[in-house]
Curated annotation (Swiss-Prot):
Class of enzymatic activity (EC top level): hydrolase
Keywords attached to this entry: Hydrolase, Magnesium, Metal-binding, Nucleotide metabolism, Nucleotide-binding
Cofactor binding remark: Binds 1 Mg(2+) ion per subunit.
SUPFAM superfamilies in the cross-refs: ITPase-like (SSF52972)
Function as written in the Swiss-Prot or TrEMBL entry: Pyrophosphatase that catalyzes the hydrolysis of nucleoside triphosphates to their monophosphate derivatives, with a high preference for the non-canonical purine nucleotides XTP (xanthosine triphosphate), dITP (deoxyinosine triphosphate) and ITP. Seems to function as a house-cleaning enzyme that removes non-canonical purine nucleotides from the nucleotide pool, thus preventing their incorporation into DNA/RNA and avoiding chromosomal lesions.
Residues involved in substrate binding: T7, G8, N9, A10, G11, K12, S69, F153, G154, Y155, D156, K176, H181, R182
Reactions accelerated catalytically: XTP + H2O = XMP + diphosphate + H(+); dITP + H2O = dIMP + diphosphate + H(+); ITP + H2O = IMP + diphosphate + H(+)
NCBIfam families, per the entry: RdgB/HAM1 family non-canonical purine NTP pyrophosphatase
Protein name: dITP/XTP pyrophosphatase
GO MF entries: dITP diphosphatase activity; ITP diphosphatase activity; metal ion binding; nucleotide binding; ribonucleoside triphosphate phosphatase activity; XTP diphosphatase activity
Family: Belongs to the HAM1 NTPase family.
Pfam families given in the database record: Ham1p_like (PF01725)
């Protein structure tokens, strides 16, 4: 079964491909099919994931999986939230987004540094699927003051798992997959579509 992954993010593709090993599913990234990314006009992770999945399903004629994820920091009123990938501007990269996050927290003092990664995954069998499978995962930790680690992407270097005392960027792939918001969401999604991707 071929499924199009509605993302241009190579890190997300690598994580999903790794976690889908053993299932009868070939995951192809939208870019490999010449599909562009739609405008993310939703106000929630769920809305944006549906927009992305529907866009890819329409253009590819294939089932589509989309993920919308981000980091919510209570001390910042839930920011960066749905704007996590473009927190420092629409063309900003991971380093600039991390720099802005740390600056915003620094301005507010050293109080509450909790943060929660959220991931919503959506599976559409076709563009007009009236009953999409929707899964959510979350991972709560602490935002550290100095980036650590070289794995992962996004805010991983500043997101510390409280039980392990390591940032997401310090974890190897199996450890991260077992704990992460994306790992949780994908496992829940697979349960919801198990009959369709069973190996």
């Amino acid at each position: 079964m071929k499924i199009v992954l509605a993302t241009g993010n190579a890190g997300k593709l690598a994580e999903m491909t790794r976690m889908l090993q053993g299932y009868d599913a070939e995951v192809v990234r939208q870019g490999h099919l010449g599909i562009d990314s739609p405008a993310e006009t939703g106000l929630t992770f769920v809305e944006n994931a549906l927009i992305k999945a529907r866009h890819c399903a329409e253009r590819s004629g294939l089932p589509a999986v989309a993920d919308d994820s981000g980091l919510a920091v209570p001390a910042l009123g839930g920011e960066p939230g749905i704007y996590s990938a473009r927190y420092a501007g629409s063309d900003a990269g991971d380093a600039a987004n991390i720099e802005r996050l740390l600056a915003e927290l620094s301005e507010r003092g050293q109080g509450d540094r909790r943060g929660t990664f959220h991931c919503v995954m959506v599976y559409l069998r076709h563009a007009a699927d009236p009953a999409p499978v929707i899964a959510h995962g979350s991972w709560t930790g602490r935002i550290v003051e100095t980036p650590r680690g070289h794995h992962g992407f996004g805010y991983d270097p500043v997101f510390e798992d409280p039980e392990l005392g390591q940032t997401a960027a310090e974890l190897d792939a199996p450890a991260k997959d077992a704990r992460s918001h994306r790992g949780q969401a994908l496992r829940a999604l697979i349960q919801g579509i198990a009959a369709e991707v069973a190996g």
